[in-house]
Amino acid sequence: MSNIDKQALREEFQYMQDHYSDPADRARQVIYIAAEALLDELDKKQQYIKLRDQEDEDIALTVGKLRVELEAAKKRMTEQSAIVAAAEKLVRCKGRYHSELNYRALAKLFGVITPDLPPLEHENVHYADAAEVEITALRQRIQELEAKLETDDKLQDGAFRDGLKAGFSYGQTDDQSGFTQCMSAYSTRAGIKVKGE
């Protein structure tokens, strides 16, 4: 119903109450009173609906504001992650040129995890011990290989000289055959294989 219809009905109700006070028209008065009560109830419900609509608009505005704030927060997080990535690169770069303690301090300052760093001496004593044992083993292996190389060089030099002597003593002009014979004799004692065998 439009406001004009409601207003006309209300005027009709008022006119009836003023002019029809006859008990014979009592049934008609009850109907008009009930209709007026229904109109009042309808007005209350429409006001309630308007109030709810206003609350819905307020909620929609609040949700819109929260979305804008969320987008701004996401943008800030993206910017900060870029800053953290740059800081991590700085920390890794600084780690190449400065001491390990400075590198760790920068990493801690920017919250960068550095799993590639070995622990410091006070963090893990066993790491230094294991490294020392490995270094000692490598040095020993190097000495063994150098000694074997010297022995092989001496053996080859001796075999060559003896091959020359043998070649001259047999009257051979091909010195290589004497070298091969002497090398095979020496190598069986030293456990070395000759290419010719």
UniProtKB/Swiss-Prot annotation:
Record InterPro entries: Ead_Ea22 (IPR025153)
Superkingdom of origin: Viruses
Similarity comment: To phage lambda protein EA22.
Protein's name in the database: Ead protein
Organism from which the protein derives: Salmonella phage P22
